[in-house]
Amino acid sequence: MKRILLYVHFNKYHKVSDHVYYQLEQMRALFSKIVFISNSDIHQEDLEQLEQRHLMDQFIQRHNKGYDFAAWHDGMKALGCEHLVDFDSITIMNDTCFGPLWDMKPYYLKYEADEAVDFWGMTNNRATKAFKEHIQSYFISFKKSLVHSKEFRQFWENIVELTDVQDVIHNYETRITTAFVEAGFRYKTVFDTTKEDSSSMLHADFSYYNPTAILKHHVPFIKVKAIDANQHIAPYLLDFIDQKTSYPASLIVDHMSQVHPPDAKYLLAHKYLPEQPISIAPSKKIAVHLHVFYADLLSEFLEAFSHFHFDYDLLITTDSKAKKAEIKGILRESGASADILVTGNIGRDVLPMLTLKERLSQYDYIGHFHTKKSKEADFWAGQSWRTELIDMMVKPADQILTTLAADAIGIVIADIPSFFRFNKIVDAWNEHLIAPEMNQLWQAMGLTKSIDFQTMDTFVMSYGTFVWFKYDALKPLFDLDLSEADIPAEPLPQNSILHAIERLLIYIAWDRHYDFRISRNEKLLTPFIDNKLLNLREGSVPHTYVDFDYMGGIKGALKYIVIGPAKAIRYIIKRLLKRRV
């Protein structure tokens, strides 16, 4: 059977996602020819990958005009109508779905053997006041009986580049079914949704609003938008796909973590470090930056570093020459070596790390830690925080670096320390006050992905900025070239630039097209603790306050709140006195 696939691709970040590679790999054997039509620019390395892996036979780069139908039209035009009839079937498809969840060959064999079918698809939409019943256009396959018809040729020859998506749906997506049905051709879908009960649905578009039904009816593709639109059940959809289909659910997590912010709840469920054999390439250059403010804690870190099974360079920063001398003595006693730099007492552990820009840029993997204590809180706040962070981020470094070897992973952070699960310290209303600083830094770094931190309730961060990362993942932060003038002096106020940076790390990596992983806290705590901590009536709403800024400050407020009402009262009294006279 000689088949051709016209495959339309679009990615706003100009990348070819792994799920697209997988899709084409799984379907390659079905087609004699694959035409890859991209409505967005793609990187040269992706183009080379598609060619080297034989996932396409012809490439068409076009501007994103006219949506998918104009792209399919251009593909057919490039092939030439006289050559289209050489194929037994023509399949049009786009990359807006994950799959195939199951082997596609049986589907093709079934409909090719059915003489009552001239064209077929995955799902259809029932007739409404606006549209007639039609196959949804993310996948349609046309058999030879239809391809050879004048109706088929006329439909595609009349495609023009429409600019309104509703016009495309009305003129092309619905008409591609009705025009052929009216000409006497017959169609079927894997899931005929017109016969399905939709009374509990907002709209009878099963591909978008009811992904559970899609899986139940063994539709081999599930829409990307359906995952995003149904996040409340996405964990269970992913579990089903992982357990009941042949599709790697990780491809869904990876793609959604790139095209949307990577911290959605259903995505976080898949962010723990994977269990895998330790493998660290000897060629990788590794640096550990340790900021030592409390020299009495240095030995604790040196002992933790003994768990490493890889070579690394230790770079220590501190705030005074006296501490540098003390650190040298501790290193000498322990038999350890390090480069020690005095960086001052501004910027805590973050600015010292950023000042090492030129040196750290030479390394493949970088670990960043500091001798953590909490002067503002109880002893156990700093003690538990530090020891748990060491257990999560220092001792399992072999496993962390094994995970960082994956091209898609750029940063590893710690899970939430237990102190923050027993005590409500990170509060959504206070986080909201940090968001403007985060937005400002985002703009200053010139990052390209769109995000507004003020719309978010809280952030995924490595508490205390203990972190492992690839330099490229955080390069924009280093390129800010922050100085002491940009950092407030100690004692550090709340919601400072340092607090903003602590919260920004995984999002900076996301903008660089990296995902993150979380090193698990082995201190097991029942989630009922979180339930008790977070579900409180008292203090669940912010205290009422008055913002005088829009009134012109305190003087303006006095005018509106005191002087204005006083004048009104005086006027009323005068009117009453006149009436008596």
Language-model regions, residue ranges each:
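ER/Golgi luminal nucleotide-sugar-dependent glycosyltransferases, focusing on the catalytic module
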Residues: 1-581
